[in-house]
UniProtKB/Swiss-Prot annotation:
UniProt EC number: 2.1.2.1
Chain positions found as N6-(pyridoxal phosphate)lysine: 228
Protein name, per record: Serine hydroxymethyltransferase
Subcellular location: Cytoplasm
Entry's transmembrane regions: none
Keywords tagged on the record: Amino-acid biosynthesis, Cytoplasm, One-carbon metabolism, Pyridoxal phosphate, Transferase
One BP annotation, GO: tetrahydrofolate interconversion
Enzyme type, top EC level: transferase
Catalytic function, reaction form: (6R)-5,10-methylene-5,6,7,8-tetrahydrofolate + glycine + H2O = (6S)-5,6,7,8-tetrahydrofolate + L-serine
Binding site residues for (6S)-5,6,7,8-tetrahydrofolate: 119, 123-125
NCBIfam families documented for this protein: PRK00011.1 (NF000586)
Length: 419
């Protein structure tokens, strides 16, 4: 096995990898942006394709010897187009942020106006945050959620679009638990002659399985990561229903912001897209949402407030102000108990961003491990018990023991699965 070669060559790095395997096996990952890639995905990513330089695109490379990496990339492109019903796909972005950067460079000029979701309301850094390239190079305005419902204020989106007439509107979020109305976003964009870009990084797996409406028919361009709910390698993806956008988008990836593509990662993306085209993947995504709704219901029954009152997708955002616990304190205590999640600002949060008033909770990893609704009731109880006894070491240690038992019953990889 590859890990054996690593242990012989570099015991220090092998030790870190081995300890991470143990951490993943014996802790419950509730981070909404994480998942467990299959062994096949990891095999492709750890293959000899890492040795090959291949600047350019299939059939149009700047290096010789690319005939087989061309095949791998074309498989990834074709599968991505089939999976999402797109006319165009670029599988070369190294990350979701670089996919967004390339799209912005294709559609905007420095100083142009964009409209995106406020980071404090669930958006993403690359949707115009002033600390991101997006906010530094472009003039972004931001929409948010309604205070009374926690759902996107589409009237505000329309008003801001009418007032500022952005050249581009971006829909998508990193901490929004409800279904996005892509048709409404498209109507607003059309009303001001703006391009609509959808960043579906968090919900790509749900979209692929038909569990969440697809943005592809409504958006000019769609970006995504290939991990998260899609359960592939870490990387980025650009899609469009408009084949005529292809040339402009391609040149912004290469030579615009990247040189040689990561062919081993592209091969792993191809494997992940192939897995996502199976009936088993559809069933998996359906269970992800069932688990999220079950977990949300059990948390609310036990007094935990959730932004928007629940979830439609793979995540929920808990507002802990009613139990006087900060997101930072919750993250620390839950991690000690073997429950890994992340502190997260909630809409209209008054806490420091490094402290926050909430936590983000997701079900993709638990679902990959094979857990279903009965386990969500157990996990909800464990979470609430820690949150309500946050300084009680006895409770935290007892919870840790129960988490270990649950993890043993649902290993991250089974001998008879694709992991």
């Amino acid at each position: 096995m590859i890990i054996d070669y690593l242990a012989q060559q570099d015991p220090e790095v092998a030790g870190a990898v081995a300890r991470e395997v143990e951490r993943q096996q014996h802790n419950l990952e509730l981070i909404a942006s994480e998942n467990i890639a299959s062994r096949a995905v990891m095999a492709a990513q750890g293959s000899v394709l890492t040795n090959k330089y291949a600047e350019g695109y299939p059939g149009k490379r700047y290096y010789g010897g690319c005939e087989y990496v061309d095949q791998a990339e074309q498989i990834a492109i074709d599968r991505a187009k089939t999976l999402f019903g797109a006319a165009y796909a670029n599988v070369q972005p190294h990350s979701g942020s670089q996919a967004n950067m390339a799209v912005y460079f294709a559609l905007l000029s420095p100083g142009d106006t964009g409209l995106g979701m406020d980071l404090a309301h669930g958006g993403h850094l690359t949707h115009g945050s002033p600390v991101s390239f997006s906010g530094r190079l472009f003039d972004f305005k931001h929409y948010g959620v309604k205070k009374e419902t926690g759902t996107i204020d589409y009237d505000q989106v329309a008003d801001l679009a009418k007032t500022h007439r952005p050249k581009m509107i971006i829909a998508g979020a990193s901490a929004y638990p409800r279904t996005l109305d892509f048709e409404k976003f498209a109507q607003i964009a059309a009303s001001v002659e703006a391009c609509l870009v959808v960043d579906m990084a968090h919900i790509a797996g749900l979209v692929a399985a038909g569990v969440h409406p697809s943005p592809v028919p409504h958006a000019d361009v769609v970006t995504s990561t290939t991990h998260k709910t899609l359960r592939g390698p870490r990387g980025g993806l650009i899609l469009s229903a408009r084949a005529d956008f292809g040339k402009a988008l391609n040149k912004e990836i290469f030579p615009g912001i990247q040189g040689g593509p990561l062919m081993h990662v592209i091969a792993a993306k191809a494997v992940a897209f192939g897995e996502a085209l199976t009936d088993g993947f559809v069933a998996y995504q359906q269970q992800v949402v069932k688990n999220a709704r079950a977990l949300a219901a059990h948390l609310m029954e036990q007094g935990i407030e959730l932004v928007s009152g629940g979830t439609d997708n793979h995540m929920m955002l808990a507002d802990l102000r009613n139990i006087s616990v900060t997101g930072k304190a919750a993250e620390t205590a839950l991690e000690r108990a073997g429950l890994t999640l992340n502190k997260n600002a909630v809409p209209f949060d008054t806490e420091n961003p490094t402290v926050t008033s909430g936590v983000r909770i997701g079900t993709p990893v638990m679902t990959t491990r094979g857990m279903k609704e009965p386990e969500m009731a157990v996990v909800a109880g464990l979470i609430v018990n820690v949150l309500k006894n946050i300084s009680n070491d006895t409770v935290i240690q007892a919870t840790r023991k129960r988490v270990m038992e649950l993890c043993e019953a649902f290993p991250i990889y089974r001998d008879n699965d694709n992991g």
